[in-house]
Amino acid sequence: MDNEIFQKIFDILQPVLPTGWKKMVLFVGYTAGSYTMKYYTCDNQGIFTDCFSQSGINRAQLIKLFMSIDKAVTPERKKLDGKNKWSVLTMIVTDDGKMKTDFDYTDISDNAIAYEQSWKEKYIK
C-alpha cells in the first residue's frame, strides 16, 4: 500500500477529529468476511479518547466513516497475495503531519478481542 491510500484514510478522518488533537491512532482489523475499526485521539495533556466516546460524533456517523475507509482500503488489500495480506493496520498521525503505519499479518479471527486489548496496551500510551 502506498502513501496515497494513507492520505486518503486521513482525509476521511480529519473532519471529525476533535479540536486540539495532538495524535490520532487508528486500528483497522480484518477477519474472514468482516472488519473492525476504531481510532483514539490524544490531547495536549496526553489523555486518549476512544472515538465512540468522542463528543460531536455519534455511532451512526462513525460507522459511515469506517465504511468509507473500508471502501478505500479493501481494493488495495485485494491486490496483495496471501503472505503479504495484512490483517491489522495501525496508522499513527500527529498534528504536525507526521505519519507512521504498522502492519500485522497475524490471523486475528479466533482472538480478535484479546488481540485488540494487547494492541491497545502497545499503542495507546
Model-derived segments and their meaning:
Residues 1-125:
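Contiguous interface-forming segments/domains that mediate binding rather than catalysis
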